Amino acid sequence: MACMAWETGPRARFTPTVRNAAGSGAIGLIQFMPSTLKSMGRTVEQAAAMTAVEQLDLVREYFEPYRNRLHSLSDVYMAILWPAAIGKPETSALWTQEGRPTTYRQNSGLDIDGNGVITKAEAAAKVRATLEAGMQVPYVYEGPL
């Protein structure tokens, strides 16, 4: 839930039609890239026409290949952002300003310490903050089940 809350943003929380503001073409609850949807036999238009509940089935399908490899919140987010980092240490560099300048630039907002290296921990920090905020009153249901 924290990953979807982060990916859809504060103004469109859990909206399945939200599109990436940077123009990547990504859409939906986990910001599916057009190429990812194509590999799943779907189109951006089909994903955009889904309700949140319908898109959750697509999210489940997307995560299926990773199901036994996700052991932390960071790993779950890496399945969305950079699957090659699943299972790697939190200190692992995802992108560097020198090594992958374009990818670094596209994600430079995740470089918390501004050192030109985006680590797995840095990339997941905003998702973790979203999770922690979501665990605060008034978001936590404490009524009868």
Spell out what each predicted region is.
Residues A125-L145:
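Low-complexity, Gly/Ser/Thr/Pro-rich intrinsically disordered linker/tail segments
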Residues M1-D113, K120:
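Catalytic glycan-binding domains that act on GlcNAc-containing polysaccharides
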Residues V117, A121-A123, V127:
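A recognition module on extended beta-rich or small alphabeta surfaces enriched in W/G with H and D/E
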